[in-house]
From Swiss-Prot:
It comes from Arabidopsis thaliana (Mouse-ear cress). Expressed in leaves and flowers. This is Starch synthase 3, chloroplastic/amyloplastic. Keywords: Amyloplast, Chloroplast, Coiled coil, Glycosyltransferase, Plastid, Starch biosynthesis, Transferase, Transit peptide. It catalyses: [(1->4)-alpha-D-glucosyl](n) + ADP-alpha-D-glucose = [(1->4)-alpha-D-glucosyl](n+1) + ADP + H(+). Pathway: Glycan biosynthesis; starch biosynthesis. It is an enzyme of class 2 (transferase). Disruption phenotype: No visible phenotype under normal growth conditions, but mutant plants accumulate increased levels of starch and have starch granules with alterated morphology. Residues 1-44 form a transit peptide. The gene is SS3.
Length: 1042
């Protein structure tokens, strides 16, 4: 009740003050405020004939806070008007003096009332606090707050009884605290003595609007604390945010801060870019000016001989009318036909230029007979041509001929000296050359501008196409799981709800009466922990999917989930141990980067022998582009192509294995590479493979690489080793290095080709945490191998990709016309013509079959030979590029090349060597690329072919089966991968199998050109880069660390 009256008094006072300070009327100053005092109100009302009782009522209501001021104010204003009208002689100064006296009295009365109410409130506050102090003291509680119910965005007082505290002997007592579990707005205040007995101290604090809890301790400003027996003091705050609201508030604050920092960073980058642009522009101007000076000097030097030879006429040979002319004038140049070798020519032509032919042939004009009447016919046969003197000409240069350019046979060139005429009215020479320099400079600048515009447009388009491809691939990656799980919306947004739809019919939970969803975020590490198990409900349609909905937090970057048959467990579908993970966009948190270290003995382009080198470089780049950290440890061969290594510098050295090992660091294709250079000469052999002690060399390297990581303080999340050559990393690490602080590191091992080093591969399979090979189908084909069969639970097939920057028809310097899927027909037509011209094939519209391969039995050489003859029978052209490591096979193909050159020289060409530029042209110019491998772990040829719009014709094996979907037979299989059919394939390893695919392909080219062109466009738009494989490898890396 006390609190009620206290608040009521305060509101009354507030209302009274508001009324008293309201806007004045248009009457004289002072009269509008007389209503606030009761006695003044009475006198005014009596003058207007009103009852005393009304006046008394008005005054009483005013004191009690019942506001009737607006009506009283109107009355006063009316009276003011009457007084002025009746007396009409009042002096304004008298009125103002009276007004001031009334104002002062009103203000004094208000102040007195306010002080009285303030005193009453303070007394009531003190009584309440004293009561609380006594109650807490009686209970032995040394601390309390006032008011007892603490609300956000208000002030409170904190009281401490020093006598009951561990600070009872301390002269100074301070409070130190913060809000919301010590996470928001820390504070420190000094406590002061109060009027309450028993040594109560207090201070005033403001509660922020975001607070749900206040946490604090007391201390003496140094090292003595009262922290509530190590539990800290806390006060709950009512009526504001709860913990979840505050967490979301923090996330929103962080998001705003990130946006602000991003804008600031973008502005800094813009300024840096502008600075770079200005510096580059300045350098370009200086370079162009220097080039213009040099070019001008060169022209000046070249012109001097012509100036020395130049004359105004040659007696009885030629002359010019008028004789005094300047640049851009039209003159007549006369020539005596009888003066030289053109006496008997039917036609005369002038082929000319200027300034010693600076612009080459720029004047071509036919002469006509002058028919001069005053000239003796015996002395000459004069002809003339009207010539416009070129602008800027100092000298005119010419010869005479019996026909136009490319049609003349006989010339008069002044005895091989050419004819040169001075321009009489020319600019002063220095001024002319200054103008010439400026003209050259302006042209260089314009050429540079146009070139930069083309390059900029091309770069922007390349970046746009790359981003669109990556976005499209991610969407297809998500949709490819739709037969098992997908979400609505497909793109999961942080801060929004998402519905997860699951089809148990296609999983281990098929037929189970219930399906339960278990999820979390950020790879099961989210601060809120896992979501409670949710029973999934049937969808509204008749499908076998079930669904549930979850709210995605603002700080999520990944959604994680598994499914089970019961709330408390039972059978789980966890995607074979990988769990289901879907990316979240728009969150304020980013996925912490993994640190991956590849230990390998091949790397493109510095030391590449086979596909392993491509994978190491391309996979590393793709993972790095996803914002993870990648290093590569590599032998420093003496045969490395150093021109591809940037910023190579000595890093350190260490001793191991009885020798010093020097470490160098450089960048290859934007990747961080550590080169190990043991001083025992193991890698100074001039080759990567081929030494009798290869196993020992690479075993030493693997151990040295692990020692380097240990001594260098590296703590990678993943060590990725490849094939037999770096397989020892797996067991050496587990045997010797896990106890040295590398306990969190996991081993991933990739098999590129099981043909070599089976024993080492088998041992690596045992020790690796996860193992992969280069395609799902090859993984199935080798699953029965004894070195793999015992480890299928950790063995995965992930298709390789290609590097879209290396294989890019839009930015390929080896093809005549850059192209994308938008102009694939025109681009490939130009490439085919160039290919035919370069190889001496007939330039005609033939279907071209390209074969780019190593000539080994694995690649199906007997099928290649058959395909060559079949293509020629179908009136096609064949281009083969490749060589054989086996001399017998090489000689066999040399004989075949000679035979084809004799019998089909205009339609077949075998280039039996490796030629990188030619391979690009074949991919671009061929209609089909044939890959008839007997087995193929992955295969890159068919992927590159599709990148260039060439349709693959392949045998169904390994990675060829995983990437090529037959246009007639694989529509459903392609649809499951969210792809369109993209080629022709066959099963057998014999001639009928090749014929079945090749004949259908060539017939499609002949019979349905428009459909075939659309197929070329389709295959170009499919993404066979590392975008998707990189995502799958990251899932594998995280699974290894789980």
């Amino acid at each position: 009740m006390i609190s009620y009256f206290l608040n009521q008094d305060f509101s009354r006072k507030k209302q009274g003050r508001m009324a008293a300070s309201g806007p004045k009327s248009s009457g004289p100053r002072g009269f509008g405020r007389r209503t606030t005092v009761g006695s003044a109100q009475k006198r005014t009302q009596k003058k207007n004939g009103e009852k005393d009782s009304n006046a008394t009522s008005t005054a009483t209501n005013e004191v009690s806070g019942i506001s009737k001021l607006p009506a009283a104010k109107v009355d006063v204003q009316k009276q003011s008007s009457v007084v002025l009208n009746e007396r009409n002689v009042l002096d304004r100064s008298d009125i103002e003096d009276g007004s001031d006296r009334l104002d002062k009295k009103t203000t004094d009365d208000d102040d007195l009332l306010e002080q009285k109410l303030k005193l009453e409130r303070e007394n009531l506050r003190r009584k309440e606090i004293e009561t609380l102090a006594a109650e807490n003291l009686a209970r032995g509680d040394r601390m309390f707050v006032y008011p007892v119910i603490v609300k956000p965005d208000e002030d409170i007082e904190v009281f401490l009884n020093r006598n009951l505290s561990t600070l009872n002997n301390e002269p100074d007592v301070l409070i130190m605290g913060a809000f919301n579990e010590w996470r928001w707005k820390s504070f420190t205040r000094r406590l002061e003595k109060t009027w309450i007995h028993e040594d109560w101290l207090s201070c005033l604090l403001h509660i922020p609007k975001e607070a749900y809890k206040m946490d604090f301790v007391f201390f003496n400003g140094q090292s003595v604390y009262d922290n509530n027996d190590s539990k800290d003091f806390c006060v709950e705050i009512k009526g504001g945010m709860d913990k979840v609201d505050f967490e979301n508030f923090l996330l929103e604050e962080k998001l705003r801060e990130q946006e602000k920092l991003a804008k600031e960073e973008a502005e800094r980058e813009r300024q840096k870019e502008e600075k770079r642009r200005i510096e580059a522009q300045k350098a370009a101007i200086e370079a162009d000016r220097a080039q213009a000076k040099a070019e001008t000097q060169k022209r000046r030097e070249l012109l001097q001989p012509a100036i020395k030879k130049a004359v105004v006429s040659a007696e009885n040979v030629w002359y010019i009318e008028p004789s005094d002319f300047k640049a851009e004038d039209t003159v007549k140049l006369y020539y005596n036909k009888r003066s030289g070798p053109l006496t008997n020519s039917k036609e005369l032509w002038l082929h000319g230029g200027f300034n010693n032919w600076v612009d080459g042939l720029s004047i071509v004009v036919k002469l006509v007979n002058a028919e001069l009447k005053d000239v003796d016919p015996k002395s000459g046969n004069w002809w003339f041509a009207e010539v416009v003197v070129p602008g800027g000409a100092l000298v005119i240069d010419w010869v005479f001929a019996d026909g136009p350019p490319k049609g003349a046979f006989l010339y008069d060139n002044n005895g091989y000296q050419d004819f040169h005429a001075l321009v009489p009215q020319k600019l002063p020479e220095e001024l002319y050359w200054l103008e010439e320099e400026n003209m050259i400079f302006r042209k260089l600048q314009e050429d540079r501008r146009l070139k930069e515009e083309v390059m900029r447009a091309k770069m922007e388009k390349t970046a746009r196409l790359k981003a669109e491809t990556k976005e499209r691939t991610l969407k297809k990656f998500l949709l490819s799981q739709k037969d098992v799980v997908y979400t609505e919306p497909l793109e999961i947004q942080a801060g929004n709800p998402v519905t997860v739809l699951y089809n148990p019919a296609n999983t281990v939970l098929n037929g189970k009466p219930e399906v339960w969803f278990r999820g979390s975020f950020n790879r099961w590490t989210h601060r809120l922990g896992p979501l409670p198990p949710q029973k999934m409900e049937a969808t509204d349609d008749e499908s076998s999917h079930v669904k549930t909905t979850a709210k995605v937090p603002l700080d999520a970057y990944m959604m994680d989930f598994v499914f089970s048959e019961k709330e408390d467990g039972g059978i789980f579908d966890n995607k074979n141990g990988l769990d289901y993970h879907l990316p979240v966009v728009g969150g304020i948190s980013k996925e912490p980067p993994l640190h991956i270290v590849h230990i390998a003995v091949e790397m493109a382009p510095i030391a590449k022998v086979g596909g392993l080198g491509d994978v190491v470089t391309s996979l590393s780049r793709a993972v790095q582009e996803l914002n993870h950290n990648v290093d590569i440890v590599f032998p420093k061969y003496d045969c490395i192509k150093h021109n591809f290594v940037k910023d190579l510098q000595f890093n350190r050295s260490y001793h191991w294995g009885g020798t010093e090992i020097k470490v160098w660091h450089g960048k290859v294709e934007g990747l961080s590479v550590y080169f190990l250079d043991p001083q025992n000469g193991l890698f100074q052999r001039g080759c990567v493979y081929g030494c009798a002690d290869d196993a020992g060399r690479f075993g030493f390297f693997c151990h040295a690489a692990l020692e380097f990581l240990l001594q260098g303080g590296f703590h990678p999340d993943i060590l990725h080793c490849h094939d037999w050559s770096s397989a020892p990393v797996s067991w050496l690490f587990k045997d010797h290095y896990t106890q040295y602080g590398l306990i969190k590191t996991r081993i991933v091992f990739t098999i590129h080709n099981l043909e070599f080093g089976a024993n080492a591969i088998g041992k690596a399979m045992t020790f690796a945490d996860k193992a992969t090979t280069v395609s799902p189908t090859y993984a199935k084909e080798v699953a029965g191998n004894s070195v793999i069969s015992a480890h299928l639970y950790k063995f995965h097939g992930i298709i390789n990709g290609i590097d879209p920057d290396i294989w890019d028809p839009y930015n390929d310097n080896f093809i005549p016309v850059p192209y994308t899927s938008e102009n694939v027909v025109e681009g490939k037509r130009a490439a085919k013509e160039e290919l035919q011209n370069r190889l001496g094939l007939k330039s005609a519209d033939f279907p071209v079959v390209g074969i780019i391969t190593r000539l080994t039995h694995q690649k199906g050489i007997h099928l290649i030979k058959h395909a060559i003859w079949r293509t020629l029978e179908r009136n096609g052209q064949v281009v083969l590029l490749g060589s054989a490591p086996d001399p017998r096979i090489q000689n066999d193909f040399v004989n075949l090349a000679n035979q084809l050159h004799s019998s089909h020289g205009d339609r077949a060409r075998l280039v039996l060597t490796y030629d990188e530029p030619l391979s690009h042209l074949i991919y671009a110019g061929a209609d089909f690329i044939l890959v008839p491998s007997i087995f193929e772990p992955c295969g890159l040829t068919q992927l590159i072919a599709m990148r260039y719009g060439a349709v693959p014709v392949v045998r169904k094996t390994g990675g060829l089966f995983d990437t090529v979907f037959d246009v007639d037979h694989d529509k459903e299989r392609a649809q499951a991968q969210v792809l369109e059919p993209n080629g022709f394939s066959f099963d057998g390893a014999d001639a009928p199998g090749v014929d079945y695919a090749l004949n259908r392909a060539i017939s499609a080219w002949y019979d349905g050109r428009e459909w075939f062109n659309s197929l070329c466009k389709t295959v170009m738009e499919q993404d066979w880069s590392w975008n998707r494989p990189a995502l799958e490898y990251l899932e594998l890396y995280h699974s290894a660390r789980k």
